């Protein structure tokens, strides 16, 4: 999900709240600090993926929700853009995987 930069299309993308649009039309709307995504924000990809949650130094970090194009969702904790900590992955077919995640893998189901 790597996108090449285009630029700040609205607001303050250095220190504040702004919108950044990438060449592939991926869009980030949210808080910025020192030119990096930091705080609460939303990334929307043209292919239907949406991440809404917390960022630290432009990485998904803290509480957040990733929604997949097929309707599946992961709701929970993130660290360095990976599922890390307590979280729930709900697949489009109704299957639910819940528990402790480490680097994107479910390590302690509950």
Question: Model-derived features: where do they sit?
Answer:
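Glycine/tyrosine- and acidic-biased, solvent-exposed loop/turn segments at the edges of beta-strands
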Residues: 1-110
